[in-house]
Amino acid sequence: MAFAYYVVGSYKRNMITHDPNTNVGFDFDFNIVFNNKHGYSPAKLKNALREALNKIAKKYQFDFPEDSTRVLTLKVKDRKQSRIIYSIDLAIVNENFTKYIHFDKTYGVNEYAYKWQAMPQGYENFSIKFETLKKAGYSKELRDEYLRRKNNNRDNNIHSRDILIQTVNDLYQLKGLYLNSSSALLLGHSNMYVLK
């Protein structure tokens, strides 16, 4: 199965932060897009990625991947200190980045637990809005506001990517910026690979 990967989130935008008093490690986010010309089910795609990661995880000091509702997560842990050094989140998305494979844990791990689901509200046109804010000269204001919100966040269920997306959407609206019909989807650098 061939796939492409795209760097997403704060790493792609040079906005990774570290607060030694509160953060434990950091993470990298990637979107995986399979060349799904055979129409494989979401479960088959997720299992193919999981099996490939299982084969290489230990070689690179990762634990085996953990399956959450949205991503497969690889973690490198400092076992002596009982902490995560860093992790990688891999979301499988469709080719136009409008849906991701959702894992419904109430079904257990089976064919029916995985389905395509629309991206959460706020994800649409995120890359375009981010680039528009940068080009309009709001990079520092965006970074400062993102850091303020991230440092004030006390809810472990709210991820950095969600804080970044909300900050971009709020600042975009606050500055009165609008998408026009000629806006193009800005994608990150991708590489093509084949799972064996």
Set out the residue ranges of the language-model regions.
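Active-site nucleotide-donor binding segment shared across nucleotidyl transfer reactions
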Residues: 1-28, 32-39, 43
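The feature captures the alpha-helical scaffold/lid subdomain characteristic of nucleotidyltransferase
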Residues: 1-3, 43, 63, 84-87, ...
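Extended aliphatic helical segments
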Residues: 7-8, 24, 33, 71, ...
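Residue-level signal for functionally critical sites in structured catalytic/ligand-binding pockets
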Residues: 10, 16, 29, 73, ...
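Short, low-complexity, polar/charged sequence segments that are solvent-exposed and flexible
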Residues: 24-26, 49-52, 108-112
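Short, surface-exposed, charge-dense and proline/glycine-enriched linear segments
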Residues: 28-39, 91-105
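Glycine-rich loops and low-complexity Gly/Arg-rich segments
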Residues: 29-33, 55-58, 113-120
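Conserved catalytic core of two-metal-ion nucleotidyltransferases
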Residues: 46-98
